[in-house]
């Protein structure tokens, strides 16, 4: 249990540092693409450390061997970290808890309409998150698909669609303003859930389910790319780690 806590602590700390680094190092015009790539990496990491790791541990390697393999996969990440460029702006390191936590919060809440910004952050992905939490139950109990069918479609096609959506969203954000991307992708996120309504009023068919899951995850990936770019834009580079951690925690 103690080892699990240490691993989780280190993982969360590394996540915060990475979010702060990408916020500091990426110029405004590259944040959409950067957000898309970070979503891609996150989803691939979920796939490798989740379903693939469970399958390999059960069939071939056992848990000890699996953890050694997962540790080895971190070596390229360490090399990439050593080669990564430093941010161009030199920012003083916080020397007290007040500078590290209190000042970033004062800076954020001192902005105009700070509470409206927080409301947007909380609500932007909320409906999509609710819908996704109900999807599996709806497809099994509401429509009548079996758990195996739903699992295969959600874990393979759904993951693939999320990755494609994030990358496509990043490409589109090179041509759209952040506001337009958030608006269009947000509307698509909401509209994509209509596919499940169609499933409820039509005959059960595997292709129909796959299409609904694909479209919903595609639009969700596009929305996630725009949303991460928004969080990066809202952060003051002097306080990027604390502010990104705060905003991402609220969105979760």
Question: What residue ranges belong to the model's regions?
Answer:
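C-terminal membrane-cytosol helix-exit motif in multi-pass small-molecule transporters
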Residues: 72-90
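Intracellular juxtamembrane helix-capping segments at the cytosolic ends
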Residues: 12-26, 221-242
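C-terminal transmembrane helical hairpin of 12-TM major facilitator-type secondary transporters
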Residues: 179-230
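Juxtamembrane intracellular "pre-TM" segments in multi-pass secondary transporters
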Residues: 86-118
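A late C-terminal transmembrane helix in Major Facilitator Superfamily
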Residues: 238-252
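Helix-to-loop junctions at the C-terminal end of transmembrane segments
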Residues: 164-183
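Short amphipathic helix-loop junctions that connect adjacent transmembrane helices
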Residues: 124, 133-152
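Glycine-rich segments within core transmembrane alpha-helices of 12-TM secondary carriers
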Residues: 32-53, 57, 248-252
